[in-house]
């Protein structure tokens, strides 16, 4: 079943084109809530940090986000999200997690930000 929306926000044609062009082993996060709504973040390294710290790979600048909040880690071509001891927790599909392997369409909540996870298999050409 192709995914056509991110819950709060329908996917644009540009979003769908970007998802279709993803290389195997990479993924895309699309922000659906927060000051960066509509922003896209490419996951293309083995480890990607998320937090309020300016040195984070993905900077989410809000007091609800810890300086070092979470890490996206790739193992055998699949990404997991790992909470980095954050104060407010990391959630996948509204469940608080310490670590969780991600699937297409999963919604990751970090502070007040919501990010939806996609790989190239989310879209059927």
Residue ranges and their predicted role:
Residues 37-114, 119:
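Forkhead-associated
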